[in-house]
């Protein structure tokens, strides 16, 4: 299936004709919608093709315009089409596919950009804060903004709306939970690094509690009170509140006083049987960002020419007591589904971006594989449940490119040996600084479940807010 406008038109017609003709739970999805493995030997006639039959009827039957009870939004931070292709080629082979990321039947592309704070003109390369603000609130903002517009005014986000409508809420990330993507659902601050009271006093003084503001990201998170929040960022909880009811207490002590349950390893997470407004759950599994899955050398100048091809290795720091993204996703779903009104859950694979910044292809690939496994968990639940919309996308594109192995590229390069046994050269060349940069290329967005057709064709990142709000029938 090729994403694009003709498909969007045909889907609109199909929606009008079929609507929700079949109850979602009774529908048997055609397996050919999800299996995109190459059908034979790549060297044979038709061997590389991924589709063997006409899928028109299968696509029609997959459509539903009914409201969703639940939404699971999965974000690959920095996961542009190039990052997906790099990871697929290495981990699954040229004819392989990701059973999560590549298996959602309805696909589109969306534009993403931020705005200059002073002029309101487009800034064509967004950061993660402005992008998360865009899909969580429906408002474009400046780079660094968390839940506020270019005038620094807060806007209600999807998690707040879901709570207002009686739904359970969850937020999962492999980053510090105060990082931009998860933070946009937890707080409203004028600068993205205002994790705790110390940084907020210096960087976001108007938000600081001692100045009459709503507080740091972590302090606002504790007030927002999502049912389940899992990831890294434990270090910030050692900071002390400067004002308010909990002045002089650490943020961890405040969380405990507010009735939160805090877990710190996989066994403790597995032991949790319920999480709700009476006792919300916080999982803090690392002081900062959680350890990545795979390690390998960072790219170097002419690394593809001067260094041998390598294979990625498991990260020994990601020990068995640290939950994976898939395990956190499964547990969040298990806990949130108990709410009879449904739930909204955001899941982020955060370090695709962070490893791209570091020009580390193995790190980037492992995090994409991790996200795919989380998507598989979400899809499995949605297929069994029949009332869940699953959406997979990214916040911005990034810097990795696949180049011919023998190319003398001007940037940083690394040669890998793929599952096929073939050389794969990855290049990072958009910055002479220590960190590679985001790019402004439009992004893939794909979906499965009720109202999934609304992601097809060309949309904008802010459309995602309205797509989810409409699907869940969220009201102010």
UniProtKB/Swiss-Prot annotation:
Function of the protein: Has only phosphomonoesterase activity.
Reaction equations catalysed: a phosphate monoester + H2O = an alcohol + phosphate
Highest taxon of the lineage: Bacteria
Signal peptide: 1-26
Active site annotation, chain numbering: 128
Species name: Pseudomonas aeruginosa (strain ATCC 15692 / DSM 22644 / CIP 104116 / JCM 14847 / LMG 12228 / 1C / PRS 101 / PAO1)
Name of the protein in question: Alkaline phosphatase H
InterPro entries: Alkaline_phosphatase, Alkaline_phosphatase_AS, Alkaline_phosphatase_core_sf
GO molecular function, one term: metal ion binding
Classification via SUPFAM superfamilies: Alkaline phosphatase-like
Cofactor, how bound (note): Binds 1 Mg(2+) ion per subunit.
UniProt EC number: 3.1.3.1
Binding positions for Mg(2+) per the UniProt entry: 77, 179, 181, 346
Organism taxonomic ancestry: Bacteria, Pseudomonadati, Pseudomonadota, Gammaproteobacteria, Pseudomonadales
Cofactor dependency: Mg(2+); Zn(2+)
Gene: phoA
GO biological process, one term: protein transport by the Sec complex
């Amino acid at each position: 299936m090729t994403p694009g406008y003709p498909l969007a038109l045909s889907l609109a017609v199909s929606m009008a004709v079929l609507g929700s003709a079949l109850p979602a739970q009774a529908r048997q999805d055609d397996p050919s919608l999800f299996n995109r493995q190459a059908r034979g030997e790549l060297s044979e006639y038709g061997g590389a093709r991924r589709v063997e039959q006409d899928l028109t009827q299968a696509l029609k039957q997959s459509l539903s315009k009914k409201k969703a009870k639940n939404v699971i939004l999965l974000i690959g931070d920095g996961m542009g089409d190039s990052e997906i292709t790099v990871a697929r080629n290495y981990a699954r082979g040229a004819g392989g596919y990701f059973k999560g990321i590549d298996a959602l039947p309805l696909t589109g592309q969306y534009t993403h950009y931020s705005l200059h704070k002073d002029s309101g003109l487009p800034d064509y390369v967004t950061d993660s804060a402005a992008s998360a603000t865009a899909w969580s609130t429906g408002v474009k903002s400046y780079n660094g903004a968390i839940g506020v517009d270019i005038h620094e005014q807060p806007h209600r986000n999807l998690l707040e709306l879901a709570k207002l409508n009686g739904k359970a809420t969850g937020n999962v990330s492999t980053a510090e939970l105060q990082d931009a993507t998860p933070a946009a659902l937890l707080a409203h601050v004028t600068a993205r690094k205002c994790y705790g009271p110390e940084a907020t006093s210096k960087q976001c003084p108007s938000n600081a509690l001692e100045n009459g503001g709503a507080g740091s990201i972590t302090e606002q998170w504790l007030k927002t009170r999502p049912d389940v929040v899992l990831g890294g960022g434990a270090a910030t909880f050692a900071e002390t509140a400067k004002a308010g009811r909990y002045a002089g207490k650490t943020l961890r002590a405040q969380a405990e006083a507010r009735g939160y349950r805090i877990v710190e390893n996989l066994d403790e997470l597995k032991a949790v049987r319920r999480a709700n407004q009476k006792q919300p759950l916080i999982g803090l599994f690392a002081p900062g960002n959680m350890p990545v899955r795979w390690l390998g050398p960072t790219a170097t100048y002419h690394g593809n020419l001067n260094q041998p091809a390598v294979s990625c290795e498991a990260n020994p720091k990601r020990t068995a007591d640290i939950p994976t993204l898939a395990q956190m996703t499964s547990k969040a779903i298990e806990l949130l589904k108990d709410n009879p009104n449904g739930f909204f859950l955001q899941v982020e694979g955060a370090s695709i971006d962070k490893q791209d910044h570091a020009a580390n292809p193995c790190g980037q690939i492992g995090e994409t594989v991790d996200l795919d496994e989380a998507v598989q968990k979400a899809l499995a639940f949605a297929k069994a449940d029949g009332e869940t919309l699953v959406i997979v996308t990214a916040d911005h594109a990034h810097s990795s490119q696949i180049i011919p192995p023998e190319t003398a590229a001007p940037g940083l390069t690394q040669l890998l040996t793929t599952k096929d046994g073939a050389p794969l050269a990855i290049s990072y060349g958009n910055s002479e600084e220590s960190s590679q940069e985001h790019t402004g290329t439009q992004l893939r967005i794909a979906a499965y479940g009720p109202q999934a057709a609304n992601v097809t064709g060309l949309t904008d990142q802010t459309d995602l807010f309205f797509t989810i709000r409409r699907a869940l029938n969220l009201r102010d």
